[in-house]
Amino acid sequence: MVNKAVCVLKGTGEVTGTVYFNQEGEKKPVKVTGEITGLTPGKHGFHVHAFGDNTNGCISAGPHFNPHDKTHGGPTDSVRHVGDLGNVTADASGVAKIEIEDAMLTLSGQHSIIGRTMVIHEKEDDLGKGGNEESLKTGNAGGRLACGVIGITQ
């Protein structure tokens, strides 16, 4: 079983980061840690997208990873995309420290996030509560600032 992964985030602007994934066992939650720099202060949507394709920048990563065909939600909602990790918050200097534990993510099996793309978005994710169609798809999180493919590590 794969139990560690990493993702290096890069975009067309100043936003960069490194995100680590650790899963102690098959039925255990995935711990997501890391740091993203170059952000505007405040909340930014943070999602795993369906494809590991960054040939056309972050746009070719496709929609949020959603193998169960659910609507968009927050990380604590029972109805959500597997890739819905909510928001990360950048401080006044534009740095977001990531510390998330998520029971829906997995690093192995049919719905593994390995080979998919992690994306940091321009705006705050409304967690599917924005009252419009786009909210139920993307959380109205806006453009894709930086992304990277999630890969196996030691």
From Swiss-Prot:
Pfam families per the UniProt record, alphabetical: Sod_Cu
GO cellular component: cytosol; mitochondrion; nucleus; peroxisome
Catalytic activity: 2 superoxide + 2 H(+) = H2O2 + O2
Subcellular location: Cytoplasm; Nucleus
Enzyme class: oxidoreductase
Binding site for Zn(2+): 64, 72, 81, 84
PROSITE patterns: SOD_CU_ZN_1, SOD_CU_ZN_2
GO biological process, one term: response to metal ion
Gene3D superfamilies: Superoxide dismutase, copper/zinc binding domain
Family membership noted in the UniProt record: Belongs to the Cu-Zn superoxide dismutase family.
Task performed by this protein: Destroys radicals which are normally produced within the cells and which are toxic to biological systems.
Lipidation (S-palmitoyl cysteine): 7
Keyword vocabulary terms for this entry: Antioxidant, Copper, Cytoplasm, Disulfide bond, Lipoprotein, Metal-binding, Nucleus, Oxidoreductase, Palmitate, Zinc
Residues reported in the UniProt entry to bind Cu cation: 47, 49, 64, 121
CDD domains: Cu-Zn_Superoxide_Dismutase
Required cofactor names: Cu cation; Zn(2+)
Disulfide linkage: 58-147
EC assignment: 1.15.1.1
Protein name from the UniProt record: Superoxide dismutase [Cu-Zn]
Primary location recorded for the protein, binned into one broad class: cytoplasm
Domain of life of the native organism: Eukaryota
A molecular-function term among this protein's GO annotations: copper ion binding
Binding note for cofactor: Binds 1 copper ion per subunit. Binds 1 zinc ion per subunit.
Subunit structure: Homodimer.
